[in-house]
Amino acid sequence: MIDWAESESGKGDKVEPKEENEAEESKDGEGTQSESGQKKESSKEAEDADVDRRVHTTVGSGSGAKGFRERANENVDRGDGKVCGGVGDVDAGVGTTGTNGGRWVVLTEEIARAIESKYGTKIDVYRDEVPAQIIEVERSLQKELGISREGVAEQTERLRDLRRKEKSETHARVAEKGRRKQGKRVHGDAQKESTEDEKTPEEPTSVGITIEGVMSQKKLLSMIGGVERKMAPIGARESAVMLVSNSIKDVVRATAYFTAPTGDPHWKEVAREASKKKNILAYTSTGGDVKTEFLHLIDHL
């Protein structure tokens, strides 16, 4: 910037001899060139003033003076359509969005427990609230989560109830709309009817419930968050338990019994015989992973 100022000032120094020559020529009394000499002098003075102004802008001090670097940045900001200011936030207004601002729910307690146990994510159970976003766990994912037949049947029943309710409400809205139109026709006000039909907004075609079928674990995790838990095998470290059996013949030497859904049709007979012993302890599973709870019980014993 200093070199540029010196070169400009040098240019200004070169202009001055021309002004002196023009002044001398005018003093010699050349009438034919006096007018043109004055025009040249005024143009040179304007050029000198422009040079002085640029030099002052470059090397001056104070709040009104700006260097080339700052001025260049301003020009870039004005010319760029994406950046609105030198200190503005380019990413302003960009944020993460959820699924219609709502949370996904499931239809049964068993499915909610299975998801929390496997992925560590707590998910609510649908309680007839509207609007709602419901996850329908389909067959392949049911096996992955270990959902029982009873749990599958419960989900199916609730889905049927929801669809039946939606269908009945849709029919009710259509019937109500038909009654309104019929009433208007009876009064013979056809013109008013057409005007009001244009002004009346369409009624919603659903009850605000979204049902999303999910077959894969990947899609489920993308909807609810969480990661699959890699469960380490649980084994008995040291226990006095020598035998685990569901045979009625082993009740005689048993010291504890544990009831859980295993598919054994004779479990009631075994439990009945075991309960007759006074020195036997009874344990039961109320939910969760039966295998894990049973192994924890063995560790406890």
Curated annotation (Swiss-Prot):
Residues 8-30, 37-55, 67-81, 163-177, 186-202 have a biased composition (Basic and acidic residues). Coiled coil: none annotated. GO terms for molecular function: ATP binding; hydrolase activity; structural molecule activity. InterPro entries: Orbi_VP6. ATP binds at residue 82. Keywords: ATP-binding, Capsid protein, Hydrolase, Inner capsid protein, Nucleotide-binding, Virion. Its EC number is 3.6.4.13. Residues 1-99, 163-208 are annotated as: Disordered. Its main location: virion. Homohexamer. ATP dependent RNA helicase essential for RNA packaging and viral transcription. Possesses ss- and dsRNA-binding capacity. Belongs to the orbivirus VP6 family. This is Helicase VP6-A. It comes from Bluetongue virus 2 (isolate USA) (BTV 2).
